From Swiss-Prot:
This is Ubiquitin-related modifier 1. Its main location: cytoplasm. It comes from Lodderomyces elongisporus (strain ATCC 11503 / CBS 2605 / JCM 1781 / NBRC 1676 / NRRL YB-4239) (Yeast). GO terms for cellular component: cytosol. The gene is URM1. Keywords: Cytoplasm, Isopeptide bond, tRNA processing, Ubl conjugation pathway. One of its GO terms (biological process) is tRNA wobble position uridine thiolation. It is found in: Cytoplasm. Coiled coil: none annotated. Pathway: tRNA modification; 5-methoxycarbonylmethyl-2-thiouridine-tRNA biosynthesis. Belongs to the URM1 family. InterPro entries: Beta-grasp_dom_sf, Mopterin_synth/thiamin_S_b, Urm1. The lineage of its organism: Eukaryota, Fungi, Dikarya, Ascomycota, Saccharomycotina.
Amino acid sequence: MPIKIKVEFLGGLDVIASSVRDHKVTLPYEEGEATMKEAVNYIAENLVTDPKDIPVFIEDGTVRAGILVLINDTDWELEGKEDYLVENGDVLIFTSTLHGG
């Protein structure tokens, strides 16, 4: 059964995803098979509207520095970052901590 998650883009990061903050996403993986690395790649390929904006989100194969990543309201660094196994019902929040002035 595919994994259903919620993805939120905050801190102005929603501009890369058609200015939509909340997304319901179905990952094409079985539960226990998808790591955050696969989820982030899927999100970049399917939610980022303009391919030119992918570097705003991804750098060197991972989420760009300056973007806070929360998995179910917990910093992803405490959950194993890219190695975390995504579960059905997870909420992934990406918040830009860099703002223009």
